[in-house]
Amino acid sequence: MANLYTKTGDKGQTSLVGGSRISKSDPQVECYGTIDEANSMLGLAYSHTGQEYIRNTIHAIQGRLFSLAAELASDAEGISGLKGLIGEEDVSFLENVVDTCTETTGKMTHFVIPGVDPASSALHVARTIVRRAERRM
């Protein structure tokens, strides 16, 4: 993995996968940064639960978020070299997760106040971060 610093004086610019440079304030950077933030919060939720299904599901979602962030952090040249682009099978996977959770917990009929335990609280924060990422796309 490359260093976290470049020592080149970025002047507010960052490189995309593929080599082009854009402003760090560009909406594209904000979008993939928000996905990274959601992924980190899922990691926190993962660390707070011992339930195998939840841990496996979080891990699978994290892998997909890494792929999504890579796509969002790429220019046209860079995206052509990526493996495992997000596709319909990923959407189906997430829909199945939602269906399984709904079967387990029942259909939501009212808003839930977060804070039951650390894992569920972290999942609620991750949910709101993902909603923000949606608005950024």
Regions found by a protein language model. Name each.
Residues 1-137:
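Phosphate/pyrophosphate-binding loop motifs in nucleotide- or prenyl diphosphate-using proteins
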